[in-house]
């Protein structure tokens, strides 16, 4: 087959050989060419693509494959790329300002900053005037996706975006210059915007498990309203996820922002309000992202507020545990074991959880031990000493001020620290059984103390004095005490005379036993001695005639004792009245009238 020897394959008429790609047209056919090998990095790929047809390379068929030829020096040079430090003539606004940019004078940092602000404001103003807002092609950023309004017109064109960017920058610079430069006046064509808007994006993609919208809005929107009140700016949540699924919103503001990421739109009339609102929003976002959900105090307060609005709030959530004293759980849910410290009761203030020496209500310098004059007192009692609860002491002080008296009220409790046994008694620290006699009257003598001091009906006051005990006094004295006590109880008069007692109250005989004036005194009637079991001072009772007295002359004496056959109580009764004196005779007075006659009454007259 002759076609194999021709060096062609099929329809390809290009002969196989070592001919290089960049061969000149005027090269010699004998293959004797001069080549200059060079490094592969001397000519880049971009240079080859741009200068493929123009430059002339000195190549040879025998050059090794993989080696890039070197561009000859007589070829055309590539145009140098423009850098950021271009010619001054390229900046049209700089030529119109007429302000120097090369500063050779000595200026402070404040002056330099003020001049920079003024220069940049003038530059932006000139660019807006001549409509030079779009930068060069090399300085432009990638264009965003186009957006259209309701009429189908594009709203985010290149000119609109750059003009708005320059206007926002000039507005911020003018606000800053008015604060730093004294007597600064903005440009004549500057119109202060009625509202300043700024967006704060929410990191929902970084923390998908956190409900940022719920934390920002709060229960019934109260958290968002509170931030608006504190900052003075209007805050709105826009972007993806701001509207719940299934709710169709016809608002153009919501529909136009659904393609953006979730963000907070802040609108205010001043920059300070916007910055304050941004700070509040960042605080909520950083707290939710850095603190676990169970320890987030903002969420706890929001849940508590929501429960209060729904009427399901339990008011015992802030109560301390009775076992450990911590807040957040009850005693039956306490994770700790039994705490003995919580069961200790302070004797100074009466509260639990600390001892008396650690009590904050204890007076400075006062002893915390139970050995003072007011020892033994329980906490909370009203007293004149320094102990007790602080509330009780304040109440005592208030009552003293209202009453106008400077003396502290007396203590009302009994015991070693009571009023009668206080430090003034001298035995306040001793036990009751260790104290000596007080020198006061016995309890049964203090019963009629007031009567003795006021004076009885029969003499001057005698005062409390030592006397026999109630069981050692005779019956007359006890009857006297009972009568006086009864009269005083029932409003009676103690000055009246009872039967058998004179007005003088003395122990003399009865009036009918006294002889008339001027008559000789009658001999005393001998009385029998009292029976053996009688009290001292009690006279014996008289016996009937023929039993206790001496028999008349001529009669034999009666038999001693009771008649035979009598025993028991009757015998004792007879023995009691055997030797008693006879009863007194009746008083000397006129004889009673004679009894009526037994004759029948006379007939009536005229019978």
From Swiss-Prot:
A GO biological-process term: regulation of mRNA splicing, via spliceosome
Keyword Lipoprotein attributed: no
Classification via SMART domains: KH, ZnF_C2HC
GO cellular component: commitment complex; cytosol; nucleus; U2-type prespliceosome
Domain KH: 201-281
Residue ranges, compositional bias (Gly residues): 373-389, 534-545
Protein name in the entry: Branchpoint-bridging protein
InterPro entries cross-referenced by the UniProt entry: BBP-like, KH_1_KHDC4/BBP-like, KH_dom, KH_dom_type_1_sf, SF1-HH, SF1-HH_sf, Znf_CCHC, Znf_CCHC_sf
Region of interest: Disordered: 1-92, 134-155, 363-390, 407-607
PROSITE patterns assigned: KH_TYPE_1, ZF_CCHC
Species whose genome carries this gene: Neurospora crassa (strain ATCC 24698 / 74-OR23-1A / CBS 708.71 / DSM 1257 / FGSC 987)
Pro residues bias spans: 550-563, 581-607
Composition bias, Low complexity: 521-533
Biased composition (Basic and acidic residues): 46-76, 472-500
Gene3D superfamilies: 6.10.140.1790, K Homology domain, type 1 (3.30.1370.10), Zinc finger, CCHC-type (4.10.60.10)
GO molecular function ontology, one term from the record: mRNA binding
Family: Belongs to the BBP/SF1 family.
Subcellular locations according to the entry: Nucleus
Higher taxonomy: Eukaryota, Fungi, Dikarya, Ascomycota, Pezizomycotina
Domain of life: Eukaryota
Positions annotated as zinc finger (CCHC-type): 319-336, 344-361
Principal subcellular localization: nucleus
Known role: Necessary for the splicing of pre-mRNA. Has a role in the recognition of the branch site (5'-UACUAAC-3'), the pyrimidine tract and the 3'-splice site at the 3'-end of introns.
Keywords: Metal-binding, mRNA processing, mRNA splicing, Nucleus, Repeat, RNA-binding, Spliceosome, Zinc, Zinc-finger
Gene label: bbp-1
């Amino acid at each position: 087959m002759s076609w194999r020897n021709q060096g062609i394959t099929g329809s390809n008429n290009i002969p196989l050989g070592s001919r290089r790609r960049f061969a000149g047209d005027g090269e010699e056919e004998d293959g004797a060419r001069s080549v200059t090998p060079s490094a592969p990095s001397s000519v880049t790929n971009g240079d080859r693509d741009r200068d493929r047809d123009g430059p002339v390379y000195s190549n040879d068929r025998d050059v090794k494959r993989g080696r890039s030829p070197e561009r000859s020096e007589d070829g055309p040079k590539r145009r140098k790329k423009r850098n950021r430090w271009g010619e001054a003539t390229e900046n049209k606004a700089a030529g119109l300002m007429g302000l120097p940019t090369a500063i050779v004078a000595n200026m402070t940092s404040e002056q330099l900053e003020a001049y920079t602000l003024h220069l940049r404001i003038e530059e932006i103003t000139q660019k807006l005037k001549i409509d030079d807002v779009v930068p060069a092609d090399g300085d432009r950023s990638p264009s965003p996706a186009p957006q259209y309004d309701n009429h189908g017109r594009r709203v985010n064109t290149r000119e609109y975006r750059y003009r708005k960017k320059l206007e926002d920058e000039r507005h911020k610079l003018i606000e800053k210059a008015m604060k730093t430069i004294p007597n600064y006046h903005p440009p004549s064509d500057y119109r202060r915007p009625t509202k300043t808007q700024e967006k704060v994006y929410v990191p929902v993609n970084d923390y998908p498990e956190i409900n940022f919208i719920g934390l920002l809005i709060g229960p019934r929107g109260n958290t968002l309203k509170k931030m608006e009140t504190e900052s003075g700016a209007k805050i709105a949540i826009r972007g993806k996820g701001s509207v719940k699924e299934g709710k169709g919103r016809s608002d153009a503001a919501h529909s136009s922002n659904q393609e953006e990421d979730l963000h907070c739109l802040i609108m205010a009339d001043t920059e300070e309000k916007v910055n304050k609102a941004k700070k509040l929003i960042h605080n909520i976002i950083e707290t939710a992202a850095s603190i676990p959900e169970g320890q987030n105090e903002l969420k706890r307060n929001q849940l508590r507020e929501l429960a209060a609005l729904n009427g399901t709030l339990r008011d015992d959530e802030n109560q301390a545990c009775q076992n450990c004293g911590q807040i957040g759980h009850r005693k039956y849910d306490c994770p700790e074991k039994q705490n003995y410290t919580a069961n200790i009761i302070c004797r100074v203030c009466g509260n639990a959880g600390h001892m008396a020496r650690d009590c904050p209500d204890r007076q400075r310098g006062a002893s915390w031990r139970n050995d003072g004059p007011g020892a033994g007192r329980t906490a909370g009692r009203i007293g004149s000493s320094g102990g007790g609860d602080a509330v009780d002491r304040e109440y005592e002080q208030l009552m003293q001020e209202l009453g106008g008296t400077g003396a502290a009220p007396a203590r009302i409790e009994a015991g070693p620290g009571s009023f009668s046994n206080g430090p003034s008694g001298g035995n306040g620290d001793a036990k009751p059984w260790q104290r000596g006699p007080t020198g006061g009257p016995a309890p049964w003598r203090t019963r009629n103390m007031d009567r003795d001091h006021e004076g009885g009906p029969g003499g001057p006051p005698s005062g409390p004095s030592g006397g026999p005990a109630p069981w050692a006094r005779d019956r007359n004295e006890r009857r006297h005490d009972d009568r006086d006590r009864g009269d005083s109880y029932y409003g009676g008069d103690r000055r009246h005379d009872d039967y058998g007692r004179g007005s003088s109250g003395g122990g003399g005989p009865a009036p009918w036993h006294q002889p008339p004036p001027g008559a000789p005194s009658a001999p005393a009637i001998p009385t029998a001695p009292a029976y053996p079991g009688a009290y001292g001072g009690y006279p014996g009772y008289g016996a009937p005639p023929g039993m206790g007295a001496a028999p008349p002359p001529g009669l034999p004496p009666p038999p001693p004792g009771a008649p035979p056959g009598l025993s028991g109580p009757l015998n004792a009764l007879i023995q009691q009245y055997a030797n008693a004196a006879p009863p007194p005779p009746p008083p000397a007075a006129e004889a009673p009238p004679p009894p009526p006659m037994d004759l029948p009454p006379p007939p009536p007259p005229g019978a």
